[in-house]
């Protein structure tokens, strides 16, 4: 993780700490049971993938969405270019509130069955 690894709330050091808490055995970091990026996603449920443009995890999220699409899984892949990691939970700017509203609308449409995948 190089892009946006510092200065945008979530840092490389904090992500490494979280990964160590989640999966201390580095031999398992690419285990399909630990990360869907390494799993067969054929036939999984439709997915909504929302990322922030300044999120160090953006590329990972977008790669997952692409993997789903390549497997024929219905997916909405939406990157909010001007947002950081956690923007949905800390919606304190006009743009983050607007992004959160769009997410809420999309999730609601998906739950109602009104989303055009």
What is the meaning of each model-derived region?
Residues 1-117:
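Alpha/beta-hydrolase superfamily serine-hydrolase fold, recognizing
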